[in-house]
Amino acid sequence: MVKQRTLNRVVKASGIGLHSGQKVMINFIPHTVDGGIVFRRIDLDPPVDIPANALLIQEAFMCSNLVTGDIKVGTIEHVMSAIASLGIDNLIVEVSASEVPIMDGSAGPFIYLLMQGGLREQDAPKKFIKILKPVEALIDDKKAIFSPHNGFQLNFTIDFDHPAFAKEYQSATIDFSTETFVYEVSEARTFGFMKDLDYLKANNLALGASLDNAIGVDDTGVVNEEGLRFADEFVRHKILDAVGDLYLLGHQIIAKFDGYKSGHALNNQLLRNVQSDPSNYEIVTFDDEKDCPIPYVSVT
């Protein structure tokens, strides 16, 4: 049987908040069977839990925020993608502020931290959401589409008319697994345009942004001295974001995802469209690991 997963032990770390510029503590804590992924604001008294649920998402300034009442946890997509890549079903993510630390702008540091905690199987079947028919979300010329597929394939295309974005590196496809995500996607960093930075900081946003946690793009190209980690790092990061956004459906998805200029808001609308009609999907489990179409790292 393919079983649910959590961590073996607590892992603690800290980093800088992208928008606040302040130090943020983050703790990963094992959670119970069917507990799901839960973000906990430990800077509040009493602490407030917010489940990682697509219906609680609000987009703000190019990131995904979980919101309940007037309480939020922002910039969750990178850590969610790391959690998804390791097949973790149940986890409490404690943060000491209203946002997850940005780390280096990729999912790599979060995968490293989670692996330090060790993976532990739980005595319950892992649930998957299998898409049964095409579902789409459209905004202007932007598209996000699910279609039936035996696995989880992500196809993404961006469209930037800019010297830093070579046309031949604006599309990418991956067949999702722990291995492909870790080696081909997880290290791809978020990116932003230098011309926007002054405006954001003047509005008390992106106060923690730097070339240590993002790819900076000016009018002519990439500002970072080390350049890009991959020739197509920009579109790989959009795939990274999509993996995190789509895991907010509550379970790993079995489908093909096609994104064209899609972002957090459109990814979330796609999930809401899936949920709006129960005939769009079914919950499945696998009695034999050989039948599971998504390969995860082994639990040792």
Curated annotation (Swiss-Prot):
Give the annotated active site: H264 (proton donor)
| Keyword set includes Lipid biosynthesis | yes
Question: Is the keyword Membrane assigned to this protein?
Answer: no
**Keywords, ordered alphabetically:** Hydrolase, Lipid A biosynthesis, Lipid biosynthesis, Lipid metabolism, Metal-binding, Zinc
This entry carries the following GO cellular component terms, namely: membrane
Per the record, the pathway is: Glycolipid biosynthesis; lipid IV(A) biosynthesis; lipid IV(A) from (3R)-3-hydroxytetradecanoyl-[acyl-carrier-protein] and UDP-N-acetyl-alpha-D-glucosamine: step 2/6
Do you know which Pfam families this protein is assigned to? LpxC
EC number(s): the record gives: 3.5.1.108
Q: Alphabetically, which GO biological process terms does the record hold?
A: lipid A biosynthetic process
What is its EC class? hydrolase
Report residues binding Zn(2+): H78, H237, D241
* Family (UniProt): Belongs to the LpxC family.
HAMAP family reported in the protein's UniProt record: LpxC
Against PANTHER family, the record matches this protein to: UDP-3-O-ACYL-N-ACETYLGLUCOSAMINE DEACETYLASE 1, MITOCHONDRIAL-RELATED
Tell me the NCBIfam families matching this sequence. lpxC
> What is the official name of this protein in its record?
UDP-3-O-acyl-N-acetylglucosamine deacetylase
Tell me what organism the protein belongs to: Acinetobacter baumannii (strain SDF)
